[in-house]
Amino acid sequence: MIKHATIVFLSFIPIFAMAQNTDDYTSFAKAYGIMRYYSPNHHTENWNDVDWFKVGYYFADKIGDNQTEDVIKEMAAVLAPEAFISNKPKSKSAKNVQSETYQYRLHTGSGSISVSGYTPYYREIITCNGEHQEYSPETGRWYCYELGDRLYLNLQSSARRDCFSKEDTDNLLLEANRLWESLYDEEGDYMSEVISIFNDRTYRVTDLTIRWNIIQHFYPYKTEDGLDWESQLPVMIGKAMSDEFDKVERNTVFAYREMLQEMYSPIKDAHLDIDGSLSFPGLPARYLAQYYAPLALSCFEDCVIIEDSGLEIEKGSRLTKISGTDIEDVIKEKSQRISQTNKTAERWSAMYEAISTVERDSVMTITYITPAGEEKTAKTKCALNRPVTMKTPKAVFEKTDNILIVNLCEAEAFNEDFYESFMKRLEEENPKAIIFDVRGYPTYYFEKVLSHLTDKDMSNGFFRTPLTALPDQKNMGYEVNTGVRKPMEPHITVPCWFLADYRAMSWAETVLMYVKEYDLGTIVGTPSTGTTGDITQFTFPAFNLILTGLHAAWLDGSRHHGIGVEPDIRVEVSADDHLNGRDVVIEETIRRIQ
């Protein structure tokens, strides 16, 4: 009887251990993020993202063989020496505080952007001076953070400068580097090495720990997106612990990236991307390529239309199946791994994911219905380059009925002479109205043209850089862009019209926000995507994370994210209109001008 009972008990050990490990790693993940970003150890200021990854791996590797609380204490001994663990919430502050001996870490934005001479995101150690900003931590106070059941981390985000040890900090990174280097087999081939890293649960736990913390502490739209990110952490840790990534096969690498995309899909940020980079320290850098069927597509609510192809497929045919699976089912499945703020844009992104693969030399079977109603199939080998266009290229400048049409998103609009060419056309043709097409990504050279559309100063205050010095975005402040766009002569007085749809995002939306805010013209079409502001990047050994780094809103503070710029005149484009060669948006605009 006892033997039977013992057998039954042992049969539950793997499940219990799995749940216990998830809780342990969840507690570790929270502690790691708080110490990394909000304990002001100035000796770590020159550490880069990969250094921090190695340190995270070093401590995560200890969990399982050691009590989680002991691992967190060991981590705190270097990164936050005056922090302590308690089994219930504590309230504590230092006495007789001399402010000038304390410091805190201030994050102005997060991540990094690679633009010469432009550094909008940075972190710095601030020496306390007795003054208190809205975002700064209280000097000498231990803030209490719940890590798990009866497990609390008490940490000073404003701490004494001399409590941190350079020797201990340097030794920690040295030990972390040694452990990382031991992961590689000098005799192994590249792909085997990469697969073995993804097979390593400690690697996966470290990776998802950092990815969770980035959103938790820095994503500027966490509130607007309604993210219950706290509850996502155990889900992510559970995924990291799953044996689905323990397979010693090439597909494990691809499956892992897809899992990351799915984990981030609740985030509604059209800039968000899990790129294909593989840059493991100690291994050659590679990029996980994506291959596409040679189809240029247009996306509508009820169908996908083939605009052009590298195959003998009639233009205007409707795509119905990919390798035997209904296109709508494929789009639905792909949408689960896409971060978008606009449903139409989400469908468009999923449409191109539907005709892509990470497998070199893959062959897809395309099923389609011709304009005559005949169902046909074609087989095609996928190519490295994504199909470029949804539309036939147009001239940058067109004229009809004394209306100047400026196609801002055409490739030739990005030539350096765009501004001069526009001003020359304007003077020579003296149009009665101007139509600017921003259905896509417009040329940056349009920036100067904006200043000719107004006779008043225009504020750049749509954009705010988050300022954080405490975890969980507590007491977040903002650095508002105080720049001003000055009017330029000659002032353009003829009516201006702007065409928009879901393809207008980022810089295109900034243009439309100026138009709307300062009444520079009339917007026709459908709403823009709802994502603008400079991007930022976080570096990982594999699959860098890219997302929006700034917070954008209208000048009165009202929300833009996820809503976009609403047109003054709404005009929807149907598949039938498109197939008949009609641009009903521009047709309606011209009709109203006349």
What do these predicted regions represent?
Residues N41-E74, P220-H271:
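Amphipathic alpha-helical substructures
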Residues A29, G33, Y102-Y152, Q156-L173, ...:
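PDZ/PDZ-like domain segments forming the peptide/carboxylate-binding groove
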Residues S27-F28, Y32-D49, A60-I63, R201, ...:
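Cleft-lining beta-strand/loop regions that shape enzyme active-site pockets
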Residues A31, M35-S39, D61, R211, ...:
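Conserved PDZ fold ligand-binding element
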Residues D24-F28, W52, Q67-M75, R204-L208, ...:
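Stable alpha-helical elements in mature extracytoplasmic
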Residues D568-Q594:
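Low-complexity, Gly/Ser/Thr/Pro-rich intrinsically disordered linker/tail segments
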